[in-house]
Design a protein with these regions (language model features):
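Short runs within selected transmembrane alpha-helices of multi-pass transporters and secretion channels
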Residues: 75-78, 145-164, 172-180, 201-216, ...
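Transmembrane helical elements of multi-pass membrane transporters/channels
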Residues: 22-42, 145, 156, 179, ...
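Helix-terminus/linker motif at the lipid-water interface of multi-pass membrane proteins
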Residues: 32, 36-58, 126-133, 189-196, ...
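Short alpha-helical transmembrane segments in multi-pass integral membrane proteins
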Residues: 1-24, 85-149, 182, 193-249, ...
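Small-residue-rich hydrophobic transmembrane alpha-helices
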Residues: 57-116, 120, 153-172, 266, ...
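Transmembrane alpha-helix boundary and packing residues in multipass membrane permease domains
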Residues: 27, 31, 43, 83, ...
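Small-residue hotspots at the loop-to-helix junctions and early N-terminal turns
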Residues: 54-65, 139, 143, 202, ...
Length: 460
């Protein structure tokens, strides 16, 4: 096996204009592959489930906000691992790297608790989303089976965060590429051939993620890099755990807040009927792919800033943000032009019903232009997290996203019960969040604060 350490990206030296895309693009490709299997599963469900195609699509789509809530909350913790390990690498603190790596692996065990809680409360949680009675049996079945994959999903994401903290981004991509092919193959067997429907899609996901998590674990056992895992050293280190939770928990809450707000919105969408649910589900799949493309630059910003902060290269931290904003802006503009321009054609791949395509296109035109705001607040929050400032972005997101979307659903939507109306809340809430995230960076000014702290320490 090739030494994975030789393939790492040096974050503290070299051209940021070159190294950030080298880091971000494999991360984006990994995230897109994660969504690709979901996209293809939606297509397979919609086209190979016979008369229940639209109902099955609605069942899977109605679960997206709920599964996103659980995944975002715990996967956000992996961002804490990323920052802590990257910062320790920048400081050349190999002891902390070792402790944080082994602590991170064991933190994924929380996935088993999620399974237990989810299996008990599956139907009540779906009922809270106003899932229609005709959709409930399939939606509940999908959720119960999907939750079995939670430990593998969490383990994979913690392992990926460990590799990325040292600049190895292709390894998680390679592992997921193999499991994605497996996932698609199993979907094609379980749904059209065995007629397992939504349960087949969920089972395929569980098997595929188990393979990818096992692959990365084996790689961590064999790697020659500083993040090598030794089974006898697997233990929860209190200091490492505290640092990871301090950064990761607010990051997880920040991600979960979006999911909570989307659950409220999904509840309003569900009240408009199965056809609207199916159309929204198809458009939502596109959003997940494009969002992850932009989010990869935020992850790059966090990791690069984390390492350079540890190495005390503060000017390079500021330049990292500037590069991520420019390159992320180009990606956002391209995404907006392509998806809005070809939206109807792309949506028709999910479901050929003209009415569903038209409804889905309303969502496309409402949300995708706001991707400029997403690019802005993601990079700003990623920059702050790289300095270990994680609570402020979480609070801004909670107030701006949850506050505005809750108000809209409960105070505005009841008076104008249309799909177009509920979609208007997205650009409004995203724009407000971006504005206050920029203000937070300007007020916190972490580079100036760092220099002032260093000057004070030197004077003493």
């Amino acid at each position: 096996m090739a030494d994975t350490a030789s393939k790492h990206i040096d974050m503290t030296t070299g051209s940021l204009w070159r190294n950030i895309p080298l880091f971000a693009l494999p991360v984006a490709a990994t995230s897109i592959l994660e969504q690709l299997s979901n996209l293809i599963a939606t297509v397979i469900i919609g086209n190979f489930s016979g008369d229940q195609g639209t109902l099955a699509m609605a069942a899977v789509g109605s679960n997206v906000p709920l599964t996103s809530l659980m995944l975002n909350l715990f996967i956000g913790m992996s961002l804490g691992s990323n920052v802590v390990i990257a910062n320790a690498i920048g400081r050349n603190d190999q002891n902390m790297v070792k402790r944080a790596v082994h602590t991170s692996i064991l933190m994924a065990l929380v996935g088993f608790a999620v399974i237990a809680l989810g299996e008990i409360f599956a139907e009540p949680m779906l009922a809270a989303l106003n899932v229609p009675a005709e959709t409930m049996p399939l939606a509940s079945l999908y959720l119960r089976v999907f939750l079995l994959s939670m430990p593998s999903i969490l383990l994979y994401n913690f392992e990926a965060a460990i590799f990325r903290s040292v600049g190895i981004t292709r390894m998680p991509l390679q592992a997921l590429a193999v499991s994605t092919v497996l996932n698609i193959g199993l979907d094609l067997i379980f749904v059209p051939v065995l007629h397992w429907g939504v349960a087949g899609v969920a089972i395929a996901t569980a098997i595929a993620y188990t393979v990818s998590a096992a692959t990365l674990f084996i790689r961590l056992l064999k790697t020659d890099s500083v993040v090598r895992v030794t089974p006898r050293d697997l233990a929860i280190d209190p200091v490492a755990l505290k640092r990871i939770v301090k950064i990761g928990l607010p990051a997880g809450i920040q991600s979960a807040v979006f999911a909570v707000a989307n659950i409220i919105i999904q509840s309003a969408i569900n009240s408009l009927g199965t056809e609207v649910m199916a159309a929204s589900s198809a458009a939502m799949s596109l959003e997940c792919v494009c969002y992850n493309l932009l989010n990869s630059f935020s992850q790059a910003c966090t990791t690069f800033v984390g390492q350079n902060h540890g190495a005390r290269q503060i000017d390079r931290c500021t330049k990292t943000l500037k590069v991520c904003l420019v390159e992320g802006g180009v990606v956002a503009l391209t995404t907006i032009i392509v998806i809005v321009g070809l939206g109807r054609e792309i949506l028709s791949l999910f479901n050929s019903d003209p009415n569903i395509v038209s409804i889905g296109y309303i969502r496309v035109c409402s949300i995708f232009p706001a991707y400029a705001f997403i690019m802005l607040y993601e990079n700003m929050s990623g920059y702050l997290r790289g300095f270990g400032i994680s609570l402020i972005p979480a609070l801004i997101t909670m107030i701006c996203v949850c506050g505005i979307r809750f108000y809209w659903v409960f105070c505005v939507f009841p008076h104008f019960r249309t799909f177009a109306n509920i979609m208007m809340v997205y650009p409004i809430s995203l724009g407000t969040t971006a504005f206050f995230m920029v203000v937070a960076v300007l007020l916190c000014h972490p580079t100036r604060t760092y220099r002032a702290t260093q000057a004070k320490a030197t004077a003493c």
